[in-house]
Amino acid sequence: MITVFFPGCGPTYPAKTMPQQLTRMVKDELQTDIHIRITGKTMWIFVPLTDLIDEKTAGWDKAGLEKINKIMNAAHRVILSTDAKLDFLAVVGADVKKFGVALLAVEYLPDLGEAVLEKFSRGEYFMRSVRDVRFDPTLIGDLTGETQSYRDISFDEFICMQIIHRAKNLFIKDKKLSNLFELKTTSYTQKFGVLKLEFEFLRKRYDLSPEEETIKPLDYVKQIAAEVIQNYNYKDIQGVELTDTFSEETIKLSLDELKKIKVELPEYRD
């Protein structure tokens, strides 16, 4: 849910007191303790949870997910009426009880403002909101987030994260692709203006039709990379290098090539 909030003349949440105000708001409204750290232009919110994972099924607990959603909505309300100079919001919802699972959500804050003004669809907003899951046993018993590291997220890093996020969604939600491939692992680095992303695509089947034989995962990832670069009209990179570590195929694209690609991806998101 995207919360719409119209700020008045002055900031309701001044930069100096905004973290304390948001912490108190979440405590009062949701009876939940959060811990905020601002690193550069990135605001991190650590949310210790005992109800993020259902112990019987080892799946997500709806109560915990709903709590994270409400905390993010509260953060949106505050961010839309603060004079703090922020580019990114990063929320870590952590199971501190048993499993040590963390759900990470990263948002580029100008996207939030454009979503409020309906400059793109709700579905596009959620595709721009990066989600990731990781396992970290040091989270168990960590009620303040002291075991975690907090960095100032760069826009190059966010671009890499969003390409990976969109690729994961595509290869899970598109029936044809999910039947053929599993995206097992991903990684990224940035060097000399080139974004280097690695994807490990495992084949699920080898009894392929002639049409299926021609399908290459990186052909889709290439379009995703172009879509992200075009969406932001991003100009501060030399290009991208995409590698499928399973097939050992690599595609290198300059910024000019990325901007000229006609994006024709499956429309499962609409």
Task: Show the residue positions of the predicted features.
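Post-signal peptide N-terminal segment of mature Sec-exported envelope proteins
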Residues: M18-I38
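Extracytoplasmic/secreted envelope proteins and their assembly/folding machinery
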Residues: P19, T23, L65-H76, L218, ...
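Mid-chain, structured segments of secreted extracytoplasmic proteins
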Residues: K56-V92
